[in-house]
Structures are given as C-alpha cells and as structure tokens.
Amino acid sequence: MKHATAIAQLEIHASNCENNAVIQEAEGQYEDAANNRTNAADYRLAIEALQAE
C-alpha cells in the first residue's frame, strides 16, 4: 500500500490523542481534551486522504 508508513504513524498519533482526551476530560482539562479530539480528527482526515491516493 502506498503511504503505509505515514498512515501507520498517523494512526498512532490519532489513537494517542483520543486516549489523552479521555484522560484530560476526567481530570477536568476540557480545553486540552477538545484540542486533542480536534487533532485526532485531523489525523483521521489525513489518513483518509492518503488511503484515497
């Protein structure tokens, strides 16, 4: 698959952001959690774009 390494790295980053968001929400860090959710969504969009090529 084209871009396999980049996609794998983006998957790792997206998962980390999603996991961090859950932790941050539990700790009351809502702004940081929202930022991580936005970043995760952006990573997922990048993954989709690379997979479409």
Predicted regions and their residues:
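A ubiquitous short alpha-helical element
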Residues: 1-7
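Short, charge-rich amphipathic interface segments used for partner binding and complex assembly
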Residues: 8-53
